[in-house]
Swiss-Prot record:
Protein name: 3-dehydroquinate synthase
EC number: 4.2.3.4
Cofactor section: Co(2+); Zn(2+); NAD(+)
Species this protein is from: Thermodesulfovibrio yellowstonii (strain ATCC 51303 / DSM 11347 / YP87)
Sequence positions that bind NAD(+): 72-77, 106-110, 130-131, 143, 152
């Protein structure tokens, strides 16, 4: 088992990475001072695959698990379904000592964390991410949110989990498209932080795409190490943590304007990374060779790199102006200076951004 730690003082927690460890979660939770009542938040597909294994493990140790299901999909990560979960918790009699488990991908993790942060002014929860994207990104760091029709993740909190429990065997059931989508976030870590990791991904592309378990554990661990280091230094995104938003300014706009139905999150982020790198190159920072490397690795892993054909640049710009990184109406983005080095919260003119979007 690989063990990492996110250092945040009293809110520090472990990330545990292994194979076939879902059946051990009940034993692990005995270490926490919690009541016996545990809510498992999941979707029907994931619950059918892994729910009973988690339930049996919890019951074996004397816990009382309750399952709350929400539909699968980004467009269900909204206040209506958060309210539904809150209602269920109240009806089941959950109190401040109760505990939540997010069993699923990024949508489940985000909405579970959000509910945990506001239910009775905050209860504990753990992340059991079952998608690659959630394992390397959204399960770590304590960002929680639900979407709003005007923008993604606009309503949210910072609420750290008590534990992140990763079983790479869950990736066996992950649809290929979702697996590839998760690789966008993995590649992002190489671009923003670690050139050697970027090169490792280039070299081991075939093994990664074949889902070699040892390689998967290796890349998940390195991605989590990078995110844990960043979050430990800047929990609430006052400066450094913004680096993790590379690709997300344009990516989130794509998701919003397509109604979260045309692109998976990683696919939109891939397009965002390419065009934010192109913007950096146009401004004279990122050299052409590094831009081509970023574009090529994403393309070679099977990720999209081009904007939707009918995407209106004016609508994109209007959506980007609502981005959380902006201050006083000024667009601030994270753009690569070189592979492994970034410019954080760099101010971009609307004119330059539209130029890149229209190319």
């Amino acid at each position: 088992m690989e063990k990492l730690r996110v250092e945040l003082g009293e809110r520090s927690y472990e990330i545990l990475i292994d194979r076939g460890n879902l059946s051990l979660i009940g034993e692990r939770l005995l270490r926490f001072s919690i009541s016996k009542k545990i809510g498992i938040i999941s979707n029907p597909k994931v619950s059918e695959l892994y729910g009973q294994k988690v339930i049996s493990s919890l019951q074996k140790e004397g816990f009382e698990p309750f399952v709350i299901l929400i539909p699968d999909g980004e467009h269900y990560k909204d206040y209506f379904w958060a309210y539904h979960i809150l209602t269920q918790l109240l009806e089941f009699g959950f109190d401040r000592g109760s505990f939540l488990i997010a069993l699923g991908g990024g949508v489940i993790g985000d909405i579970t964390g959000f509910v945990a942060s506001i239910y009775m002014r905050g209860i504990s929860y753990i992340q059991i991410p079952t998608t690659l994207l959630a394992q390397v990104d959204s399960s770590v760091g304590g960002k929680t949110a639900v979407n709003h029709p005007l923008g993604k993740n606009m309503i949210g909190t910072f609420w750290q989990p008590s534990l992140v429990w990763i079983d790479v065997d869950t990736l066996e059931s992950l649809p290929e498209r979702e697996f590839i989508s998760g690789l966008a976030e993995v590649i992002k870590y190489g671009v923003i932080w670690d050139k050697e990791f970027f090169e490792f991904l280039e070299i081991n592309r075939t093994k990664i795409l074949k889902k070699d378990k040892d390689i998967l554990i290796s890349i998940i661990k390195r991605a989590c190490e990078i995110k844990a280091e960043v979050v430990s230094k800047d929990e609430r995104e006052s400066a450094l943590r913004a680096i993790l938003n590379y690709g997300h300014t344009i990516g989130h706009a794509i998701e919003t304007l397509t109604g979260y139905s045309s692109y998976l999150h990683g696919e939109a982020i891939s397009i965002g990374m390419v065009h934010e790198a192109k913007l950096s190159s146009m401004l004279g920072f990122l050299d052409k060779e590094d831009f081509e490397k970023i574009r090529n690795i994403l393309k070679e892993f099977g990720l999209p790199v081009n904007l939707p054909i009918n995407m209106d640049s004016s609508a994109m710009l209007k959506t980007i102006l609502l981005d959380k990184k902006n201050i006083e109406g000024k667009i601030r983005m994270v753009i690569p200076d070189s592979i492994g080095k970034m410019k954080i919260n760099f101010e971009i003119s609307g004119e330059d951004l539209k130029k890149v979007l229209n190319e």
